[in-house]
Amino acid sequence: MKGFSRFGAIATFAVLMTVVFAAPMSAVDKKDWTVMVYMDGDNNLETYAILNTDQLELVGSDANVNFVVLMDTLAGPADLLYVMDGRSESVGKNYGYPKEVNMSDPAVLEQFIEIGVRDFPAEKYAVILWDHGGGWRGICWDDTTLELYGIDDCITMTEMREAFAGAYEETREVIDVVGFDACLMAMPEVSYQLRDYASFLVFSEETVPGLGFPYDMLAADLVAEPTVDGEEFAKIIAKDYSDYYASISGCIDVTISVFDMTYMDELTVAVDDLGTELLASLSTYVNSYQKDQIQADRYYYPYNVDLIGFAKNLVNDSSIDDAGIKDAAQKVVIAAEKGVLVAYNSIVNVGSTGLAIYFPSTHDGMHSLKEEYKTIPFAVETSWYKFCEAFSDFNGRTWAKKTG
């Protein structure tokens, strides 16, 4: 870590005043991109938060790109930072920063997005959510809130949508790229919550290493080509991430994918139809479903199953002769493959295709999280929750083991 890199270099009063006021003044002009990083380091990831901010400072904002970070750590209060080449300056005085905030509060996220759009205007916007992730179970845990109030809080899927919806109502801006620098977030249960408010998502089916996104690489690439659109920048993030971890020995279970939200509705309808078909023939084909689920890639949470892999297994399963099931499964494959623009995987996850879905294989696996999953809009607004519940409750299954 560079000394004082979070808050800028120590200088004489005159120089400091010049630096402090240069950032917000130059940021007023509309640029090509504003990248907002919601960096929740108020937990055991604090060291990585500082590291990633230092990486951004290796490039910094310029005439075409703004990098804005809301950074919270265990060691001190949160601060709103404008990242420049070699330093970051506090620019949140008008909003009371630095101050202690609960990064698990969706209102804090909403305000941050609104500040980024209003105070750092651009043609295109990216928001990166940085912290621990639990897939549909949530993102952004705040340990200071836990220590002070005993509340193990996070931003839930419902709250995440509320934050982006609220920011949209204030700014009328759809976010071009939402990146999840957090584990296990590449799920339709997650992407469904950002329909209408985001164009492209970058996320991982598997866990994300503590080092997270390579911020120096993605920042350098964006500054070098600031006119890229949302799809291109999302692909840049994914490619840089893949290349970065391919260069590090031992990183063998890394995944990253880009999802085009244009296809979210089509995918939702397809999964709904598949759940209905699977449920209707559950008593006939339960063991086939079990086998096809186990043969698909799974992740740190073993109840997260690769969606396209499972659907393709159904299509190719000779023990299933129900045309309705196969047709519905094929439509899931088509919709998901349209939506997943790129998917990079390391050797452990070579069969991963970019989206996982919650599909527990055991009764306990379903019922330990049943009440939580019932709160997930994608699950209950489609047939998927009903299918998972019925499947987990069904007696007489033959337990298969993954082959190959």
Q: Model-derived features: where do they sit?
A:
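N-terminal extension/subdomain marker
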Residues: 28-122
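Residue-level signal for short, function-critical loop segments
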Residues: 39-41, 73, 131-133, 361-363
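Gly/Ser/Thr-rich loops at beta-strand to alpha-helix junctions
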Residues: 42-45, 131-137, 179, 183-187
